Amino acid sequence: MPRGCAGARFACNACLNFLAGLGISEPISPGWAAMERLSGLDAFFLYMETPSQPLNVCCVLELDTSTMPGGYTYGRFHAALEKYVKAAPEFRMKLADTELNLDHPVWVDDDNFQIRHHLRRVAMPAPGGRRELAEICGYIAGLPLDRDRPLWEMWVIEGGARSDTVAVMLKVHHAVVDGVAGANLLSHLCSLQPDAPAPQPVRGTGGGNVLQIAASGLEGFASRPVRLATVVPATVLTLVRTLLRAREGRTMAAPFSAPPTPFNGPLGRLRNIAYTQLDMRDVKRVKDRFGVTINDVVVALCAGALRRFLLEHGVLPEAPLVATVPVSVHDKSDRPGRNQATWMFCRVPSQISDPAQRIRTIAAGNTVAKDHAAAIGPTLLHDWIQFGGSTMFGAAMRILPHISITHSPAYNLILSNVPGPQAQLYFLGCRMDSMFPLGPLLGNAGLNITVMSLNGELGVGIVSCPDLLPDLWGVADGFPEALKELLECSDDQPEGSNHQDS
């Protein structure tokens, strides 16, 4: 192993000489120093992907085409997308790897990039309502992306109930974006005016050949012992602090403490979705009424909707549900990578019958969970995953399906709240009326609920597997009911009162 490797992005002479000694010799391209390597967390979503677990981040947009300059045609839409993508290199980058690479893959420019490889067109069946749109989008969500091309697709869905509308589904691999980065990527295709000129083209970072990828990978691999020497003490300290917190009752929900539900089980290859939309003014009224945060209200809405759904099916657990919640650390982490998030576990107390007590319990629990997550730090998870590779995570994916979840799943669902723009946006010239985010399913948690705000509305996207939950509209329709309940319920219960169903 060569010595003298100090970083993970540039290849040192020792690495180049080491590889040259193996008979690997290729010219160095001028742009290879800018080659971007996936972080461990980025690559995690590649390594954990299986045919029954596609790890894509999606969003469904409802567009008013009457604002498109010149009028909407698919050809104009295609041409507009082509112009905007030229200004966003992320849309033109694909994975590159080699068997000699000891680190994670890299992003390089796709020299054969063509919009037609990524843009699809499909007609919505009659009558063109939300159920027909959801059926198409659920099918698309379950399709894998082609890893030989940039990891995204856009589907234009025409033929809705109104002639001046189309729906668009954008699907991007989780290795490319997390929730916040996905919103930023989407913004590259938006403007504040329908006739805004397309941005100027931006050059990509170039490519990388076998030697370049292997050399910089060898450098990163050689630096792992140094990084491990830092991570292990930090982990030990975190474990000690967590034990002390547990003695005082100041920890987030523990993994594998979740009750069994109908949406916890082995995942199939298919996906189904449902969605709904709420008025952000009402959400903020609930926030102000109870003196809580928007995140607390989102969890309370989820708890109320799931309570209604589980009660209707006679399977409401006596214990609180447990959600894993991604927490953005884009403004707190100095680690490289597209995905800048950690996770926390929060309780979703659907067993509490009184909505006022339910949201107060949620607010108190979330305060503890956020404090615990902050104590763990924004980079510990990222640092540990950095050491994992395809072999380790592949073995995990072979083992996990055989772990019994009859009594206590690791968690019941994934719950995410992504902040969105509070302005009227135009997507390639079309007015964006609604946006519904859709997250992936992971492990044996067959339910993902993601919300995102847009111009005074809160879009709620729900994803599951039809093998577990054949019909999600009962969950989606529970959100407006849960919001109404929080707006109208009495709040005269004494502090600490906890009404539960027996």
From Swiss-Prot:
UniProt GO MF annotations: diacylglycerol O-acyltransferase activity; O-acyltransferase activity
Catalytic activity: an acyl-CoA + a 1,2-diacyl-sn-glycerol = a triacyl-sn-glycerol + CoA; di-(9Z)-octadecenoylglycerol + (9Z)-octadecenoyl-CoA = 1,2,3-tri-(9Z-octadecenoyl)-glycerol + CoA
Induction: A possible member of the dormancy regulon. Induced in response to reduced oxygen tension (hypoxia) and low levels of nitric oxide (NO). It is hoped that this regulon will give insight into the latent, or dormant phase of infection.
InterPro entries reported for this sequence: Acyl_transf_WS/DGAT (IPR014292), CAT-like_dom_sf (IPR023213), O-acyltransferase_WSD1-like (IPR045034), O-acyltransferase_WSD1_C (IPR009721), O-acyltransferase_WSD1_N (IPR004255)
The protein's Enzyme Commission number: 2.3.1.20
Pathway membership, UniProt: Glycerolipid metabolism; triacylglycerol biosynthesis
Gene Ontology cellular component annotations, sorted alphabetically: plasma membrane
Keywords noted in UniProt: Acyltransferase, Glycerol metabolism, Lipid biosynthesis, Lipid metabolism, Transferase
A GO BP annotation: glycerolipid biosynthetic process
Active site: H174 (proton acceptor)
Coiled-coil region list: none
Family, as annotated: Belongs to the long-chain O-acyltransferase family.
Function per UniProt: Catalyzes the terminal and only committed step in triacylglycerol synthesis by using diacylglycerol and fatty acyl CoA as substrates. Required for storage lipid synthesis. Upon expression in E.coli functions weakly as a triacylglycerol synthase, making triacylglycerol (TG) from diolein and long-chain fatty acyl-CoA. Has very weak wax synthase activity, incorporating palmityl alcohol into wax esters in the presence of palmitoyl-CoA.
Name this polypeptide is given: Putative diacyglycerol O-acyltransferase Rv1760
Protein source organism: Mycobacterium tuberculosis (strain ATCC 25618 / H37Rv)
Higher taxonomy: Bacteria, Bacillati, Actinomycetota, Actinomycetes, Mycobacteriales
